[in-house]
């Protein structure tokens, strides 16, 4: 946890902090010359200005780091009082209704922000993670005055260890909990259930079709697969609406099987005027899907290798 009682921006940078951060960055192999260290406009962070590179924003303990230029939000600041700040323990939880309301009021000039935009607390109190409905992530100060398209990485034992995995997993679990379970097409394990995965899929994605061919085998190994309709290809929204419009889950599974295994699309019945795909697709924006199929364990961990390799079953704990 970050033991800071106030924003770094409220302080000048002490000699001890300056020295500590320089030491941390030298140990992890930062080659660029450090020009200066100053309070960041992101709460509880310091800005490290580098020669020839975008600045770093880093916590006083040197654990959490972001690289990127901060953009000043052009919107008028309508809410001056920032709501109560979260703690590191809330990382990966959706922000409170009060925080979301104040953020959106202060982002009125940004047309791609809406009540559907997901925002989450991060491990850095006062720094919020958000994503557009297209799934593009960004970070912002909780007063919504400064935004960057960077991500929060972690430094541990003198090494960059990549993105904050604890945050990512907790965020993804928050997203799963928000999904309408009745609009997931679920393929239950056909033996004792040993694992549950969520898969963001598109009927026209070649790798999604390849994964779907493994469905019966996965189910037989005790894996329950919950499918999130995540159309990316141009033709997919209408085609997937037809599948999700089928009357019951068995019919939906059959229609999805036909699309994935035979390339046959099932049209929506004339009586179905509801879009059952988009609500969960929008809720899933917080997953920040880069490509389909995106495969997650129910503990929120994203699988990042080939599902055709033995590693996949190892990842699921069912090898």
Label each PLM-derived region with a short phrase:
Residues 25-28, 32-67, 71-72, 106, ...:
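C-terminal cap of thioredoxin/glutaredoxin-like
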Residues 3-33, 85-115:
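Short, non-transmembrane alpha-helical segments in secretory-pathway proteins
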Residues 49-98, 102, 153:
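Mid-chain, structured segments of secreted extracytoplasmic proteins
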Residues 1-18, 197-212:
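Short, thiol/selenol-centered motifs that function as redox-active sites or metal-ligating centers
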Residues 78-88, 168-175, 217:
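C-terminal low-complexity, charged extensions that often adopt amphipathic alpha-helices
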Residues 187, 193-273, 285, 290, ...:
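Structural alpha/beta surface segment adjacent to cysteine/selenocysteine redox centers
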Residues 144-163:
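P-loop NTP-binding catalytic core
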Residues 157-186:
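N-terminal "domain-start" segment that seeds a small globular fold
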